[in-house]
Design a protein with these regions (language model features):
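A conserved pocket-lining segment of Rossmann-fold NAD(P)-dependent short-chain dehydrogenase/reductase
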Residues: 89, 162-184, 208, 212-223, ...
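CheY-like receiver
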Residues: 69-73, 110, 237, 265, ...
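N-terminal Rossmann-like NAD(P)+-binding domain of SDR-like oxidoreductases, especially those catalyzing
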Residues: 1-214
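Hydrophobic alpha-helix immediately C-terminal to the catalytic Tyr-X-X-X-Lys motif of short-chain
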Residues: 192, 196, 200, 230, ...
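Short aromatic-enriched loop/helix-cap "lid" or pocket-rim segments at secondary-structure transitions
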Residues: 42-45, 132-137, 221-225, 293-294, ...
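C-terminal substrate-binding subdomain of Rossmann-fold SDR/epimerase-dehydratase oxidoreductases
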Residues: 25, 59, 239-378
């Protein structure tokens, strides 16, 4: 397999644009298809960081007339275009299914019904397909509890319990073969995307990989999108002299991975066959509480602002999920290099030197959750 022309959908976005830089630097010809979604690109124009050596097409992955010619001109497709937010997906159901599921279906329909040269497809999946992460019960071994009941959250009983004996369980790194449980519309669409791509890939002999991203952070992350990842939301709050809001007690365990390590893994997926036809966790392998991340951001900023721990929950939130990256390590030779301290220092420096990077719309997003009844009342 020899790739030369790569199409990156959503390539003006955060992860996509960093991958475009790496591919251009590696000698690939790169075309970007992006609709410049206003929620992400507030100016409605191509971002200043867009690599000048790539070709840019403004268009939508649901528009066959725009999408098909670009697919047919490529020998590799990286499909990142998507609507991204767990909470928002619960009240913009049609939009999320239309953009994520239908957009992916159109890509696959083109591949199945047109003469093309595509030799590799990557589709962005998510930690969200797991629902809760993996757990071990002291009595019953590996267990897979589902989303916590509203009554449990209202009682501030944050930790997961064994579905058999109902005792508290221990969080362990989540492998790709863990049972999947979709507890929100966004996660359902990511599951559909990866399942469709891997199925069509296997059926028609088109090597395909579904990277399951854990909590990715780094420069170019949309700090003004209140539906983005928690680190970006907290940094935006801090830069606007407001406290980061941490749900529950802040003890939720996550895996935060630098955008640079993510891009390294994606390039390995494109260039090596070791993960073909598989979903693959993309994380750092490090475990940290979200409260520790909020405190780290404040400290690295030199701020005296303390996180606000709400001791309230959201109906769709999981408790713990961290990455077992054995598959990426063993099949691709993936080795994360960026520490949390290094990575968040870089993110902060970028945010400080980028005009209007952090406009705080968090309160608006919170009000929407409140209005839709998605916050748990204690």
């Amino acid at each position: 397999m020899s790739l030369h022309n790569i199409l990156v959908t959503g390539g003006a976005g955060y992860i996509g644009s960093h991958l475009v830089d790496a591919l251009v630097g590696g000698g690939y010809e790169v075309t970007v298809l992006d609709n410049l979604e206003p929620q992400v690109h507030r100016s409605g124009t191509w971002p200043s960081y867009a690599n000048p050596k790539a070709t840019y097409v403004r268009g939508d992955v649901r528009d066959r007339a725009a999408f098909e010619p670009l697919v047919l001109a490529a020998d590799g497709v990286v499909h990142f275009a998507a609507a991204v937010s767990v909470g928002q997906s619960m009240y913009q159901v049609d939009r999320y299914v239309d953009v994520n599921t239908r957009g992916t279906a159109l890509l696959l329909d083109i591949l199945v019904n047109s003469k093309h040269n595509v030799q590799k497809v990557l589709v962005a999946s998510s930690i969200g397909v797991y629902g809760e992460g993996a757990y071990r019960c002291a009595t019953h071994g590996l267990v897979a509890p589902t989303i916590r009941a509203e009554e449990q959250l209202a009682a501030k009983d944050w930790e997961q319990r064994c579905p058999v004996c109902h005792e508290h369980v221990e969080s362990i790194p989540t492998p790709e073969d863990k049972a999947l449980y979709r507890d929100n519309i966004y996660s359902m669409t990511k599951y559909h995307q990866e399942e469709m791509v891997l199925l069509i890939g296997k059926t028609y002999g088109i090597p395909a990989v579904a990277p399951r991203f854990f909590n990715v952070y780094g420069p170019r992350q949309s700090l003004s999108n209140p539906y983005a990842g928690v680190a970006a939301i907290w940094l935006s709050r801090l830069l606007n002299q407001r406290e980061p809001v941490v749900f529950e007690d802040g003890g939720q365990l996550r895996d935060f991975v630098s955008i640079h390590d993510v891009v390294d893994c994606l390039v390995l997926m494109l260039e090596k066959p070791g993960a073909d036809y598989l979903p693959v966790n993309v994380g750092s392998g490090e475990v940290v509480t979200i409260l520790d991340i909020a405190k780290m951001l404040s400290r690295l900023l030199g701020s005296s602002i303390e996180p606000k721990v709400t001791l309230t929950g959201r109906k769709f939130d999981i408790r713990h999920n961290t990455a077992d990256i054995t598959v990426a390590r063993e099949r691709l030779g993936f080795a994360p290099k960026v520490s949390l301290e290094q990575g968040f220092s870089e993110l902060i420096e970028w945010a400080r030197t980028t005009p209007d990077a952090a406009v705080d719309f968090f309160d608006k997003a919170m009000q929407e959750l409140q209005d839709k009844g998605l916050l748990v009342k204690s």
